[in-house]
């Protein structure tokens, strides 16, 4: 009888742990980094944002094509009928700054969580720039986003 109670208790514990793990697991969201854009010099709002249209994109970014033989120097095309753009823009600086997205996850409540790190390194440059990252995510993940700066 004692062995049966031990087995039942162990099974209940295993099932509870498995259900808890399944209920709290976030789904990773794939994304693509947009290339060859720059932050417009009239942008004053540096808060992270989700961009839903070409018009909205053009309020914050310009296109910066570069020469290449294979066409890789063109700005990434964004189809706003299928994708949203996520922009993380930092304040103007003269120190090398990297914005790295550590994860984008869809939570069980339907919201997305975007975690990112900002690191600065090196000596000051004689010029300044506005560090940013611009990534594309599928619209199926929605546009209710929480940004977490790590």
What are these regions (language model features)?
Residues 1-9:
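Bacterial N-terminal signal peptides that target proteins for export
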Residues 10-18:
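Bacterial N-terminal signal peptides
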């Amino acid at each position: 009888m004692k062995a049966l109670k031990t087995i039942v208790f162990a099974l209940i514990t295993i099932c509870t742990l498995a259900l808890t793990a399944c209920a709290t697991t976030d789904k990773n969201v794939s994304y693509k980094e947009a290339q060859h854009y720059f932050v417009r010099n009239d942008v004053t709002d540096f808060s992270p944002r989700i961009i839903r249209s070409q018009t909205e994109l053009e309020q914050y970014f310009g296109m910066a094509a570069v020469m290449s033989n294979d066409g890789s120097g063109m700005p990434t095309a964004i189809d706003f009928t299928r994708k949203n753009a996520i922009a993380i823009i930092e304040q103007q600086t003269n120190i090398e700054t990297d914005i790295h997205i550590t994860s984008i996850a869809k939570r069980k409540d339907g919201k997305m969580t975007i975690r990112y790190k900002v690191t600065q390194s090196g000596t000051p440059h004689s010029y300044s720039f506005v560090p940013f990252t611009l990534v594309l995510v599928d619209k199926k993940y929605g546009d209710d986003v929480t940004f977490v700066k790590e």
